[in-house]
Curated annotation (Swiss-Prot):
Organism for this UniProt entry: Bacillus cereus (strain ATCC 14579 / DSM 31 / CCUG 7414 / JCM 2152 / NBRC 15305 / NCIMB 9373 / NCTC 2599 / NRRL B-3711)
Binding-site positions, ATP: G38, Y39, S40, G41, A42, G43, K44, S45
Function recorded in the entry: Part of the ABC transporter complex MetNIQ involved in methionine import. Responsible for energy coupling to the transport system.
SUPFAM superfamilies in UniProt: ACT-like, P-loop containing nucleoside triphosphate hydrolases
InterPro entries in the cross-refs: AAA+_ATPase, ABC_transporter-like_ATP-bd, ABC_transporter-like_CS, ACT-like_dom_sf, MetN_ABC, MetN_ABC_transporter-like, NIL_domain, P-loop_NTPase
Protein name: Methionine import ATP-binding protein MetN 3
CC terms in the record's Gene Ontology section: plasma membrane
Membrane topology note: Peripheral membrane protein
Record's keyword terms, sorted: Amino-acid transport, ATP-binding, Cell membrane, Membrane, Nucleotide-binding, Translocase, Transport
Length: 341
């Protein structure tokens, strides 16, 4: 569906060239929700603007739906852009137009007749949950409602791809989840390919099928979300995953408990998918003559399944502890020893 091949974007500056995107290679399948995560300055905003040619690549090739979009210009490019919707962090609405008029705007530009425009706007208002707000102005809307207008406007021309540029960064956590649920629903209903950029791992966890991690203009890691959670390879990816699996309070609690109970071993168990539902600790206590204390645990739901983490203190004879660890491995649960007694 979307293919980036050796794509590079270099900006000219007085201080010298700035490479915002450095030889990016990506393949995004039709109908998936693909996330790009990175800290500020990683190059993710420059990357997503290459998809619809708001920015032109310095080199490389971008193909969307079998069309090399990086090689077209003029009316052909304008037509191609109608198949690529985009929403923004700060909504970019026309403040002098009502909700209906904002949604209708791209249809006017495309030359759609008035009756068809009215029907399409009605469909979109219903789709994004803005019934009764069609005559309101942006200044009368909440942040979440403004973004719903932005989504409806982006979908007006029935695009194949929806680009989301930090679409939830300006929203509170509850509204963020509501917008993410809406995007997930739209993806399932319409089979729409969604590409989003964010600095929040929560966004990736909640709706993405796959993720690419960017750092200093480079894509340093790519994979299914669950695989990245289970086995992050790069240091930056590990930091993002720890946003969800750890916290400073949790780490301080574990450290204090390790000091309080210096004997035995402290282990971290990671559960992926169906493994979350296995009675691992129950089996452990049934077959081992050791004491088992749970220090910390959490479960996160991703778009591909569940991910769980459990920190446990094992106390007893060294041989019994080792046998218990081997038994956990047999249950196909990933294990890391984080403290030795």
């Amino acid at each position: 569906m979307i293919l980036l091949e050796n794509v590079k974007k270099i900006y000219k500056a007085k201080s010298g060239d700035v490479t915002a995107v450095d030889n990016a290679n990506l393949k995004i399948e039709k109908g998936e929700i693909f996330g790009v995560i990175g800290y500020s300055g990683a190059g993710k905003s420059s990357l997503i603007r290459l998809f619809n040619q708001l920015e032109k690549p310095t080199s490389g090739q971008i193909t969307i739906a079998n069309r090399v979009i990086s090689a077209i210009t003029g009316s052909e490019l304008r037509k191609a852009r109608q198949e690529i919707g985009m929403i923004f962090q700060h909504f970019n609405l026309l403040w002098s137009r009502t909700v209906r008029e904002n949604i209708e705007f791209p249809l006017e530009i495309a030359g759609v007749d008035k009756a068809k425009r009215r029907k399409r706007v009605d469909e979109l208002i219903h789709l994004v949950g803005l019934e009764g707000r069609g005559d309101a102005y942006p200044s009368q809307l909440s942040g979440g409602q403004k973004q719903r207008v932005g989504i409806a406007r982006a979908l007006a021309n029935n695009p194949q791809v929806l680009l989301c540029d930090e679409a939830t960064s300006a929203l509170d956590p509850e509204t963020t989840d509501q917008i993410l649920d809406l995007l997930l629903d739209i993806n399932k209903r319409l089979g729409l390919t969604i590409v989003l950029i964010t600095h929040e791992m929560h966004v990736i966890r909640k709706i993405c099928n796959r993720v690419a991690v960017m750092e200093k203009g480079k894509i340093v890691e790519t994979g299914p979300v669950l695989d990245v959670f289970r086995n992050p390879k790069q240091d930056i990816t590990k930091r993002f995953v720890q946003q969800l699996t750890d916290s400073e309070d949790t780490n301080e609690t574990i450290e204090s408990l390790i000091e309080k109970y210096p004997d035995g071993k402290v282990i971290r168990l990671q559960f992926i998918g169906e493994a979350v539902e296995r009675p691992v600790l129950q089996r452990l206590m049934q077959r081992s003559d050791i004491e088992v204390s749970i220090l910390q645990g959490n479960i996160a739901q991703t778009n591909n399944g569940s991910y769980g983490s459990l920190v446990v203190h094992l106390n007893g004879e060294e041989t019994a502890i080792q046998q218990a660890i081997e038994g956990i491995h047999q249950d196909q649960v990933e294990l890391e020893v984080i403290a030795h007694g």
